[in-house]
Amino acid sequence: MRRLKIIISYDGTHFSGYQVQPGERTVQAEIERVLAIMHKEEKVKVTASGRTDARVHATGQTLHFDTPLAIPTDKYRKALNVQLPRDIRVLSVEEVAHDFHARYSVTGKRYRYIWSCEPIQNPFRRHYTVDTNGVKPDVVAMQKAAQAIIGTHDFSCFCAANTSVQDKVRTVTSLQFEWHGEELHMVIEGNGFLYNMVRIIAGTLWEVGIDRRTIENIALVVASEDRDKAGKTAPPQGLYLEKVFY
């Protein structure tokens, strides 16, 4: 048996998330469907670095699975792409050691969140950015406030209340804002992220940018470890899983 690591990109618009759900269209289900065809209807279990929610995108999601097929990796990639729907693309296939694990070998992740600040939003970007109705935030204030998030903290304040995870300590190594034309990008890296953590951070820092929350308030929110003290969860379509580090 060979263990293959694959990196995929997907448009999350028409998926009910990454993880298999009965009766729903998901990224994992589509990949396992195609692998079953390639393996003569034998089920192949795929493991991802983590799940993404409905309408969330990925440009660098990483998976692994075991296969007995002796197909060269480049041909494996082409075979998958021929049969996968057009909103999923396999970017690379690599044979790895058997102790590699797409989830447990992760050392860090990078996410990107995008707001469209155009006076009139481009309709072709509506599924891939969050429309601000022309509002342009104070990015200098947002960047200053972000400094309170960088570092190792208990991030309970930026975690969905319904999570079952007990240990909420994570390390955010970088959090930057960048203008790309009329789009504002938030790029965040860390050793791991809690459920909805990036979207809650985005929603909270956005409030700083539009003067609904002070720069100093963010440090208080982090120290509170209280979800109710943070802002709203930002919409899913602006979020991208950009890269997984090993």
Curated annotation (Swiss-Prot):
Keyword tags: Isomerase, tRNA processing
Keyword Disulfide bond: no
Entry EC no(s): 5.4.99.12
Broadest EC class assigned to this enzyme: isomerase
Entry annotated with the keyword tRNA processing: yes
Protein purpose: Formation of pseudouridine at positions 38, 39 and 40 in the anticodon stem and loop of transfer RNAs.
The protein's name in its UniProt record: tRNA pseudouridine synthase A
Gene: truA
